[in-house]
C-alpha cells in the first residue's frame, strides 16, 4: 500500500503494474474512493480521491481483474477457524452510475458450478487460516476469471450491507 502519492505515481509510471488499474483506499466501504485508471494521466486524480476516503491515509493500487460471469458477493461465518457457512450471490453493476463499482443488485444463488464454488470456499478458508481468523462473520467480494482462477477482492470481518444477510436468510433458512 501507499501513503505517498508520488511513490505510487513513480511505481505506476515505471511499469510496476499493467493497465488497467484499480486504485482504492484500504479502509473504506461501499466502494467509496475506488476508481479505474486506464492511462497514466488519470492516476494522480484517482490516487488523491482514494486517499480522501481513507481514514488511515493509505491506498492500494492493483491490476484490474477481468471477471468471467458475475462478480461474487456473499457472506460467511467461521467458528474456531473453520469456514462453516457461506452463501454466494451474483453481483450486478450499472456502468451508467456515478461509481460503477457499487453493486446495484444481487441475485441468488450464485450461478457458477459447484466445483468453482468449492474452489472459492477453499480460497477463503486458506486466507482465514493464514490470517489466524477464528470466529467471525464475513462479507466477500470475489472475482473468478475465464480460467476459474479465484481473486479475493475483499474479505471483511463484518456482515454485508444492503440487506444481504436478510436475503441469505430468506434464500437458505439460515
Where are these regions (language model features)?
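A short secondary-structure junction signal
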Residues: 33-35, 164-167
Amino acid at each position: 500500500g501507499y501513503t505517498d502519492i508520488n511513490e505510487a505515481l513513480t511505481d505506476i509510471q515505471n511499469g510496476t503494474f499493467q493497465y488497467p488499474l484499480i486504485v482504492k483506499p484500504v479502509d473504506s466501504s461501499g466502494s467509496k474512493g475506488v476508481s479505474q485508471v486506464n492511462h497514466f494521466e488519470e492516476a494522480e486524480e484517482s490516487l488523491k480521491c482514494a486517499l480522501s476516503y481513507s481514514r488511515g491515509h493509505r491506498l492500494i493500487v492493483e491490476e484490474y481483474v477481468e471477471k468471467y460471469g458475475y462478480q461474487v458477493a456473499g457472506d460467511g461465518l467461521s467458528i474456531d477457524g473453520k469456514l462453516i457457512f457461506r452463501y454466494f450471490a451474483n453481483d450486478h453493476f450499472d456502468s451508467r452510475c456515478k461509481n460503477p463499482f457499487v453493486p446495484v443488485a444481487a441475485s441468488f444463488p450464485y450461478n457458477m458450478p459447484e466445483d468453482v464454488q468449492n474452489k472459492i470456499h477453499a480460497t477463503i478458508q486458506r486466507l482465514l487460516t493464514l490470517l489466524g481468523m477464528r470466529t467471525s462473520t464475513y462479507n466477500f467480494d470475489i472475482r473468478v476469471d475465464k480460467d476459474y482462477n479465484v481473486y479475493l477482492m475483499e474479505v471483511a470481518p463484518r456482515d454485508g450491507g444492503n440487506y444481504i444477510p436478510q436475503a441469505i436468510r430468506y434464500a437458505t433458512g439460515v
